[in-house]
Design a protein with these regions (language model features):
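Metzincin-family zinc-dependent endopeptidase catalytic domain
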Residues: 45-151, 163
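Bacterial Sec signal peptide processing site at the extreme N-terminus
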Residues: 20-31
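Catalytic glutamate of the conserved HExxH
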Residues: 151-159
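Metalloprotease/metallohydrolase-associated module, dominated by Zn2+-dependent proteases
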Residues: 119-147, 163-203
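C-terminal motif of bacterial Sec signal peptides marking the signal peptidase cleavage site
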Residues: 15-18
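Bacterial N-terminal signal peptides that target proteins for export
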Residues: 1-7
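Fold-level signature of zinc-dependent metallopeptidase catalytic domains
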Residues: 30-43
């Protein structure tokens, strides 16, 4: 009888510890994601600051990192450009839980799209993912920095699990091989509500 009593006490204690751990995990999950802006060395520092400033208007938890070299393994010699998926893989290795890294470059970047082995793009972000990359190479001269910011915030959205959005003014609009950034103004309400479920704390 006494043995059963001790066994019951042990089970209760283990259950309490388990509940405590679950509560701790919930507290950790409630922390907002921190966006790390990672410029590559080809980037102008003023452009990096502009993009970071624009992101902060929407989402305040952000830090600019020191500029680094583009990873050598991402260079695609045949087309004189860089593979976006390789850049993302490189950045992801150095991105821990609770952080998302956005790489910024002026160089041309590409990825495989369907039957096209090397398709030039403005940016790439996997859904979900720890990192993404945006390039200014394919942007027009008018409002170039503003366009660059919109490409960056679009790719960050993908890392958080957002799909392309049918709302034409939303940052998550599908470019469809074009550059619709001048028509984009903000995340739509549906996309914002989704980001809130990912612990985004909007201003």
């Amino acid at each position: 009888m006494r043995r059963n009593k001790y066994l019951f006490i042990i089970v209760v204690l283990l259950w309490c510890c388990s509940c405590s751990k679950k509560k701790d995990l919930n507290i950790l999950n409630d922390k907002p994601v921190i966006i790390l802006v990672q410029p590559f060395k080809d980037m102008n520092s003023e452009t990096t600051k502009f993009i970071a400033f624009e992101i902060k208007k929407i989402y305040p938890h952000l830090k600019i990192l020191d500029a680094i070299d583009l990873p050598k393994e991402s260079y695609y010699k045949e087309r004189n450009r860089y593979r976006a998926d390789s850049i993302i893989q490189y950045l992801s290795k150095n991105t821990t839980n609770g952080f998302v890294t956005i790489g910024l470059t002026t160089k041309d970047i590409s990825t495989t799209k369907g039957a096209i082995k090397d398709f030039g793009i403005m940016g790439l972000g996997f859904k979900p993912g720890r990192s993404c990359v945006a390039s200014s190479f394919r942007l027009t001269l008018n409002n170039k920095n503003d366009q660059f910011f919109k490409v960056a915030i679009h790719e960050i959205g993908h890392t958080q699990g957002l799909k392309h959005c049918p709302v034409k003014s939303c940052f998550m609009r599908d470019a469809e091989g074009k550059n619709p950034t001048d028509e984009e103004t903000d995340f739509c309400n549906n996309c914002k509500n989704f980001l809130k479920t990912q612990n985004w704390k909007f201003k």
